[in-house]
Structures are given as structure tokens and as C-alpha cells.
Amino acid sequence: TRSPPSTIQQVDPVTDKREYRDDYDDKTLYIPGPTEVRDDVIEAMTEAPFGHRMDRMTDLYTTIVEDTKTFLGTDNDVIILTGSGTEFWEATTLNLVDEHVLVPTCGAFSERYANVAERLGKDVDRLEYEWGNAVKPEDIREALDASDKTYDMVAGVMNESSTGVRNPIEEMGDVISEYPDTYFAVDAVSSLGGDYVDIDAHNIDVIFASTQKAFAMPPGLAICVVSQDAYDREVEKGTSSWYGGFRRTIDYYERKGQTHSTPAIPIMLAYRKQMKRMLDEGHAARDERHREMMEYVHDWADEHFAMFPEEGYESQTVACIENTQGIDVAATIDEVNEEYDMAFSNGYGDLAEETFRIGHMGEHTVESVKALTDAIEDVAEL
């Protein structure tokens, strides 16, 4: 028997198999994702399978790609691939970066973007902020001016769901536009579809998201919007991600109207159904609905607790609330789950008991979010 390499850390198994049952209670999801999915969207996944090289697949894939462009208001290319948005942490780094990356870090997911780039062998400089604070565009300018390096990419997070911070990516993109050799990639996993951003107007070379957040679709697909400059950069660079390469995916779409590899067709059928609903609602109305939910939760938090993020930089899709009353967050979550069949989240990492988080995105409304806050008030005796 071959021995495992000594460089691999050996750990004990975390748990034995826990049998999945058929009788779980349904819970209404107010977590930072996945979020609620409409019954008709779930039903769309039950169509009989068909071949991923059939004309029917071309009809499906071109529909969801072009409808996504329309919804987001972009003339840039759109890629929809099976996988998590995490895939594009790797793909953007491999496609755009020769050596140097600047990552403004202000929470768990921006830090993870930096970690991914380091694992891919890139030279990463961090512009660090205390958790709860937002990235400041002028700090990016100072970092770009002060460095003797030419950064290939600035990697930003639009919506830091670990802290409930919404970073000003529009202004960040405007600053980075002054540095033509530096590309701007944005993780918008927990905000795109629920917080409008004019992608084409603000030098955003790549922006990517996942279906299970504000798009209110089942997990399993990643959406990526790619500028012509980013596409050209990958071609010039000559090396890229195999699975998430811009040239490979976009060229295959232009030639065939399909994905280069077998996709999760049932989830794409659900995507088509939900995107039709999103187009019917309209991005402006959807954005306003999310803003109304944000304002409701903020007013509620101000009455009973406090908002954790820096004022003026609060997320439009995920509220991170400071536990100023010292409630038992874990016990409150469990009791709300048990008594009301509603799920919300504790704080992230070290903030587990200091904060709690409410996902108010996707198909939620002020009325549905109020049902959760009423339940929290009841259980926590606020």
C-alpha cells in the first residue's frame, strides 16, 4: 500500500455517515444563502433529461445567457457554468494575473479571495480593513501609486456577507480605470441580482455571482460577466483556467451556443423560469424591493440592537446585526427554527455570538422579513 505524502496533514474523520431522511420539515430561509426558491422554479427542474449537444440545449443556453445580459443591462459577455461562484476566484486569477494582485480585505470572503490567489502562486498584497469597515477607493489609489509593482488585478468583494458590508465597487472601478494595466475583478456572489450596479460604466472587467443568493435559484450555477478588455488580456497572457477560461467559454458560446462541458441542465431550466420572473419584475423594481427590505431591517435593528457595518456601507441583501442585548444567538436561532420553521444565521467566525445575520434577498418581501423579526422578538423576549 502506498503511503500518503508526508506533506498532507492526516486528520481523524469528523463524523460517520448520517443517513439522509425523507421527513425533514421545510424551513423558510433567511440565511445569507441559499435563499428561498419558488415552487414553480423547483418544478421546472423535473423536465425529462435531454442531450447537452441537442438544438434544445442551444435554445436553453442562449435564452438564459441573453436574458441575463438584458436583466443586468450589460453589453459584455456572460458565462453561465455549472459550479459555485468560488470557481471564478480561481478563474479570474488564472486568466488575468501573471504575478501581482492587490486584494482589499474587510471580511472572510475578501480574505479567501486573497488566499486563493496565493495558493495559485501569485504575489498578493492586502489592503486590510477591520471587519465591519468598508474599502475606501482613495486607499486603492494610494496603494497603486505607492507600490513599485504593477498589479495585474485588483480583486474586490462587492458584498462582504460575513460582516454585512457593501463596498463601493463603482467608485473603486472608477479609480482603477486610471491604471490601464490593472484589471478589476469583483465577487458579487451575495448581491448581484438584488443590488443594482452599472457594470459597463465603472470599469468592472469581471463580475461574478452564484444562483443561490439574490437570483433566488437553486445552487449549482455560477454567472460571470466579462469585459472585452478582460477577454483580450487572457488571450494576450496565453495561459488561463481550463474550465473557467474566458476565451474557451465565450468562443464556444459564439460558435455553438452551448457550454464547453456538460452542464447541470435541470438547474438551467430553473434558471430560465426564474429569470423570466426577474425580467417581468424589472431590475429597478427588484432593486427597490431589496432596498425596502434593507431599510426595514435596519430600522428594526436600530430599535432593538445595532447595525454592525460602518454607517453608509450596509449591504442591501444581508444584514449583520450587532448583539448589543447579549442574547444567546445560537439558542435563539435554534428556537426560532424549531417553533417557527425559520432559519437565520449567527455571525461569521469570531463574530458568531457578537452578531447575527439576516438574508433579505431574492423573493423575500418586507412582509416575509417582518415575520422573521416578529419571531425573533417573541423568542428573545425583546
For the regions a protein language model found, what residue spans apply to each?
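PLP-dependent enzyme catalytic core of the Aspartate aminotransferase-like
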Residues: 7, 11-14, 27, 350, ...
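A glycine-/small-polar-enriched, mobile loop at the entrance of the PLP active site in fold-type I
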Residues: 24-82
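Active-site C-terminal subdomain of aminotransferase-like
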Residues: 36-37, 212-298
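Conserved beta-loop-alpha segment that forms the PLP phosphate-binding cup at the N-terminus of a helix
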Residues: 75-102, 106, 110-114
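Active-site phosphate-binding strand-loop segment of PLP-dependent enzymes
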Residues: 135-191
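Conserved active-site segment immediately N-terminal to the catalytic lysine
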Residues: 200-212
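Conserved PLP-binding catalytic core of the aspartate aminotransferase-like
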Residues: 307-339
